[in-house]
Amino acid sequence: MKILLCCAGGFSTTMLMDSMKRVVKNSKKLDENTFTFKAIPVDLLQSEVEDTDALVIGPQIAHKLDTIKPIIEPYHIPYVIVDKDTYGKMDGATVMKMVFIAQKKAQMNK
């Protein structure tokens, strides 16, 4: 599963990405070899979106959703917007749960 994390500059999202990687690595149910993560600034989304399975949007760019949706909709990529509290705690476990829920919903709507 390729998970793309997107924020204003890609720096703080890298810390969240590392937390998500630890969750996958420490999980008994998930195989870390089947996951790839990448943190990018929103300005690079168009060039990075292909082959993405889920998009994680940082709270600092939630207001750009109207710009983001037209980029990801042709690829049918499920997305989550991380709330400020979860983001501030760098809570990778909660974000991974959000990603899995978004993926399930997307599969049910196919």
Residue ranges of each PLM-predicted region?
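Conserved active-site segments centered on acidic
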Residues: 2-44, 51
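Short glycine-rich anion-binding loops that position phosphate/pyrophosphate groups of nucleotides
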Residues: 9, 60-62
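Short glycine-/acidic-enriched loop or helix-start segments at secondary-structure transitions
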Residues: 15-16, 49, 65-68, 91
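Class I S-adenosyl-L-methionine
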Residues: 21, 25, 66-69, 73, ...
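Short, Asp-centered acidic motifs that coordinate Mg2+ and/or phosphate
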Residues: 54
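A short, gly/pro- and small-residue-rich
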Residues: 63-86
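Ser/Thr/Gly-rich flexible loops in soluble cytosolic domains mediating phosphotransfer, phosphorylation
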Residues: 78-110
